[in-house]
UniProtKB/Swiss-Prot annotation:
UniProt KW Phosphoprotein keyword: yes
Cell location: Cytoplasm
Signal as UniProt keyword: no
List of residues that carry O-(pantetheine 4'-phosphoryl)serine: 37
Role, per record: Carrier of the growing fatty acid chain in fatty acid biosynthesis.
Record's protein name: Acyl carrier protein
Family in the record: Belongs to the acyl carrier protein (ACP) family.
One GO CC term, this protein: cytosol
Pathway per the UniProt entry: Lipid metabolism; fatty acid biosynthesis
Amino acid sequence: MSDIADRVKKIVVEHLGVDEEKVTETASFIDDLGADSLDTVELVMAFEEEFGIEIPDDAAETIQTFGDAVKFIQGAV
């Protein structure tokens, strides 16, 4: 797993309180990891802070899974 993926996973585990094993590439933040809409906003803000990037609202709406987050961040850094 890449450094970016490791850092994203750490943020997801910390913010959602889920086991690392549940955070897979296709794991949906809402459907699989129990996040609500506020959690997803907080995740996006945490990703922005961790990686020093800005995620526009329209892009944030497309980040539904762990894999989506990693791909977006890899393209933004």
